[in-house]
């Protein structure tokens, strides 16, 4: 996406259009008898800081699935690996409090908040001087922008298959984060996946997605390695290539690749 590294307030007309689409989608769900809850937004266009770092603005509150991992009755706040998303969990705290009060079986958990010091990143990794071919070599070797300084994971790197949790190892989730998930969910089997064809492996939904029991679509440019396919093949899951996106490039102001069409 051309938006990599960009931040700040979006044009009002794009905000109004997005809100219109969101309201229409919420209304459609309500007509079908689905309960729709909305997060409480913060002022994202403000500087934030911890004792270790500061950044000029926050990200937003569009994708709840990035922040909250729901497994059974538990809703787990992910660590997050972007400094600009460090406080994003606050948007969902009112809802989590509400669910906790409504359901005596609900568990609200939070993973250890990372410090995200410079030790957590290879600081020159995203330099514009580094070409795509070099990035593909790095991701094939599982060398990513995040280090193993502390556990890091985004909820959007996790796919749930009953008692199996498939977790993408990439930019936003490291091996310590995957190990933390294994310890936190002892009654689940946690598997690490990686996709060497992706130079910017962030979140699994535009790469690998289950459509129904027994059928998975995989981004044809980011195929799951043969060794990691075995668990699916042994359990009679079919992995097929996803259809090509309708567009060649993302729309203006979009942070995602065209392969978001898979979600």
Regions of interest found by a model, annotated:
Residues 1-263:
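The feature marks the mature, well-folded catalytic cores of soluble enzymes
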């Amino acid at each position: 996406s051309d938006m990599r590294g960009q931040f700040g307030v979006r044009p009002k007309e794009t905000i109004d259009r997005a809100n219109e689409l969101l309201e229409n989608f919420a209304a459609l769900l309500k007509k079908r008898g689905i309960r729709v809850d909305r997060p409480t937004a913060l002022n994202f266009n403000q500087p934030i800081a911890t004792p270790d770092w500061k950044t000029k603005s926050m990200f937003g509150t569009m994708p709840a699935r990035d922040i909250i991992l729901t497994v059974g009755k538990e809703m787990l706040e992910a660590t997050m690996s972007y400094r600009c998303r460090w406080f994003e969990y606050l948007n969902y705290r009112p809802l989590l409090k509400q669910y906790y009060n409504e359901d005596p079986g609900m568990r609200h958990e939070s993973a250890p908040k990372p410090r995200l010091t410079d030790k957590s990143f290879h600081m020159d990794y995203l330099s514009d001087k580094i070409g795509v071919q070099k990035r593909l070599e790095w991701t094939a070797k599982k060398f990513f922008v995040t280090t193993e300084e502390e556990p890091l994971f985004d909820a959007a790197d996790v796919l749930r298959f009953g008692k199996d949790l498939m977790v993408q190892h990439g930019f936003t989730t490291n091996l310590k984060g995957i190990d933390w998930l294994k310890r936190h969910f002892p009654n689940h089997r946690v598997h690490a996946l990686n996709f060497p064809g992706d130079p910017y492996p962030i979140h699994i939904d535009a790469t690998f997605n289950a459509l129904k029991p027994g059928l998975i679509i995989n981004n044809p440019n980011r195929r799951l390695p043969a060794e990691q396919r075995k668990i699916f093949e042994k359990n009679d899951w079919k992995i097929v290539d996803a259809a090509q996106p309708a567009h060649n490039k993302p729309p203006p102001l979009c942070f995602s690749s065209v392969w978001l069409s898979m979600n």
